[in-house]
Amino acid sequence: MKCTSRLIPLLLSALSFTACVKGPEGGGKKVRGNGPVRIGFSMDTLKEERWQRDKASVEQRCKEVGAECEVQVANGDDAVQTKQCDNLLTKGVDVLIVAPHNGQIAASIVEAAHRQGVPVISYDRLIRNADVDLYVSHQVVKIGQMQAQYALDHVAKGNYVLIGGSQTDNNALLLMDGQMSVLQPAIDRGDIKIVAKQFAREWLASEALRITEDALTKNNNDIQAIVASNDGTAGGAISALPPQLVGTVLVTGQDASLDAVQRVVEGKQTMTIYKPIRPLAFSAVDSAIKLARGEKVDAKDRINNGKNDVPSILQEPIVLDKNNVMQTVIKDGYHKLEDVYKNVPKDQWPQQE
């Protein structure tokens, strides 16, 4: 896969212009007035801890601003997600927030919503080839670049394994593009060698374990770095490492899930990417209310989804390693000190200010 194919349209975001977003025209649906806005939140899964946080944060913000919210979870089933969204539309929601399982298939959800004049916000994962009204996410390509740059900064030479996420998730492709944009010059110089590069089906830890075991076998355990795209795949990869390599092989991650941050402070996982969820969820809810009321949403970036340059609100990711745990997830209240360090002798715990 060439790393430039999806990066070129994404460079539009660097222009940092402001797009004034309004909901879909037509469809016969009246703009919601001053009454409570009814938001339908369609989620792919609650399996990972981070998605549980998304759900809680969306519900919290809806309660704070007086919006009504109904959450539907598809459990990784495209047909179920489509049916659930149809059900939400039948119930008369004013706006849909969709975290798609499959960004391609979810295009039909956008079409169905627009036929009823209901705007759609693509949440965290981009819905492809559809007239999405707004995309709310983190800077996904940048996350991949941050993972790869961290790896290169700490392991400048050696054999690398790259583990992506689900190929049905556009974010997995963008992450890999970001990683390769940083790693390719080092590959060309002969400094590093990619000995395995695979996508983990459904982001499964078991898939990451299999990929890592295979790479270890084929390379006689001679692996120096594993660029895992999220914490679930990082955990799977670490499970595959023989004891003498745990803590020696660099392993990246993403999401700052509790188990991953525990691994970071224990020296098993080298780093993760912390993506504060509340700003993401809050901006989605606030934007949903504006769209439902026909008000303008200021979106400073645009991301191409194969059909349009979608107005986008992108949050900044943060590198997390053992050196800044206290200044990030602990300080923000994302995790508790006693939970993060529970497997570390108490006399080695840092002091909490």
Tell what function each PLM region has:
Residues M1-I8:
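Bacterial N-terminal signal peptides that target proteins for export
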Residues I8-P9, N308:
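Residues embedded in well-ordered secondary-structure elements
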